[in-house]
């Protein structure tokens, strides 16, 4: 299947897995909306794409904020006309903090980005993909082997990655009748 004319949104596109994935989509011919908290890192990702940078759109985004996620999808549709793939990659962690020392704020920060952020982006992707012509698309969630083999002192991260499994399965089921597929990758240790 040709990627010509296809559009992807990649969250966490300024570093690590997100950056590599965004560059891979560009190499395959996709237009890519680069989403992340730090504009300067998104611009660096675009610059690394070389001539393909003309097919990028850097959108500073806080995936935990509904208005920011809506703005990301709106800007992407305005620039490229549609959304074919969403890679929910943005993530946070509090690894190394013993459960008994974990603050509510640390817990909430990880849940807000990893689970709520993925939900908000999935919701906007679903709305967009359901209403575009031709309809449908792919939503790919970044899971983790930590959901199955937790790292010590990683309760919030591990819990959110379990949540991603449930969200992915539910979205996959709900999306079938609209030609929206949803899957997840369980990436092991990687530089992020």
Where are these regions (language model features)?
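The beta1-alpha1 cofactor-binding region of Rossmann-like NAD(H)/NADP(H)-dependent oxidoreductases
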Residues: 60-72, 104
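Substrate-binding pocket helix/loop in short-chain dehydrogenase/reductase
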Residues: 97-99, 106-108
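Conserved glycine-rich cofactor-binding loop
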Residues: 14-16
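Active-site-adjacent segment of SDR/Rossmann-fold oxidoreductases
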Residues: 133, 149, 170-180
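Active-site helix of classical SDR
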Residues: 122, 160
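Residue(s) in the substrate-gating loop at a strand-loop-helix junction
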Residues: 144
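Active-site loop immediately N-terminal to the catalytic Tyr-X3-Lys motif
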Residues: 99-100, 149-155
